Amino acid sequence: MVLIRVLANLLILQLSYAQKSSELIIGGHPCNINEHRSLVVLFNSSGLLCSGTLINKEWVLTAAHCDSNNFQLLFGVHSKKVLNEDEQTRDPKEKFICPNKKKDDEKDKDIMLIRLDSSVSNSEHIAPLSLPSSPPSVGSACRVMGWGKTIPTKDTYPDVPHCANINILDHAVCRAAYSNLLEKSKTLCAGILQGGKDTCQFDSGGPLICNGQVQGIVSWGGHPCGQPHALGVYTNVFNYTDWIQSIIAGNTDATCPP
């Protein structure tokens, strides 16, 4: 475990450029050590890939564009420099992406389920987050978190994950900024209208948490991050709850909503 942790630290510190969906938190602050128990690190030999969300002891939710070969998942991490005794590392056993996802459109159905090679144990720093029971309403207060950039135009990354409070905004706000935005049922528009708080590079795949439930998955947004009226776009998890539950139940041929 110590060797794996050392390697993971080296990889995470080798942060390289990735699209906005893998971003860091802009305008946030260091998360409390116990408030991100469901946050997962995805990494491979090149470094940090993305974040994810533990939704039960055997399954992780992340973005489809985070898919890569030979990655591992790290649970219970707070500081890259200080080991938590309950940190756990797992390999993916199976990966599920919507079979009806448009292959030439990275933004379409940007959701992936990962089954772990063995279950993780709940602990002081590890616990799953609930799937949504209903979609969030416009104006809902939400929380984002991750190890992404903290300054939009610089490769500045934190030792511990940063958190920020943002709001669900009307879909029309994002539609005005992004002509290629998917329909309302598939995505959530979230951020601060005047800018200053946003997800950024290497936050991709991480959770948008509203009312204690994972309502969104960090997908994409404006460049640089955190600009006025250029909000973050998140996969709408509620739209995919039936698919998620079907896959977990063993129906691996389940299809996502069109």
From Swiss-Prot:
Propeptide part(s) removed at maturation, as residue ranges: 19-24
Role of this protein: Snake venom serine protease that may act in the hemostasis system of the prey.
Assembly, per entry: Monomer.
Listed GO MF terms: serine-type endopeptidase activity; toxin activity
Enzyme active site: 65 (charge relay system), 110 (charge relay system), 204 (charge relay system)
TM region positions: none
UniProt entry keywords in alphabetical sequence: Disulfide bond, Glycoprotein, Hemostasis impairing toxin, Hydrolase, Protease, Secreted, Serine protease, Signal, Toxin, Zymogen
Protein name, UniProt field: Snake venom serine protease 3
Signal peptide annotation: 1-18
Known glycosylation sites: 44, 239
EC number: 3.4.21.-
Enzyme class: hydrolase
Record SMART domains: Tryp_SPc
Tissue specificity note: Expressed by the venom gland.
Gene Ontology terms: biological process: proteolysis
